[in-house]
Amino acid sequence: MKQYDIIVVGTGGATIVADAAIKVGKKVAIIEKGKFGGTCLTRGCIPTKVMVTAANAIQEVEEFKKIGVNVGDATMDWDTVAKRTWHMIDKSAGIYDYYNAYDNVDVYRGAASFVSDKVMNIH
């Protein structure tokens, strides 16, 4: 059975803890059952921001017309927006490579559950 100083379940916001532990030489386990990056990167904040940015740009074009700047009618190319969104999500693969490069980090794929107060199971 492997021993760790820190076990981080999920690769969302808790990776801040993993980063701090890695920097001071602690033995770290990271457990992720889904895409690396957590909810924010994969289906929350980042995808939403890509879509909101596109929508804001359309609105800005409409505002330009009010001050005499005419750039034509703005339209949304949903295929391009979707590609950009997936590009941002796919960058999460780099998070796995980042952590896997450290000798003091073990990355596990799966769900974690406690067996006892100091023992975890990955399934």
Give the residues covered by each predicted segment:
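Glycine-rich flavin
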Residues: 2-4, 19-26, 31-123
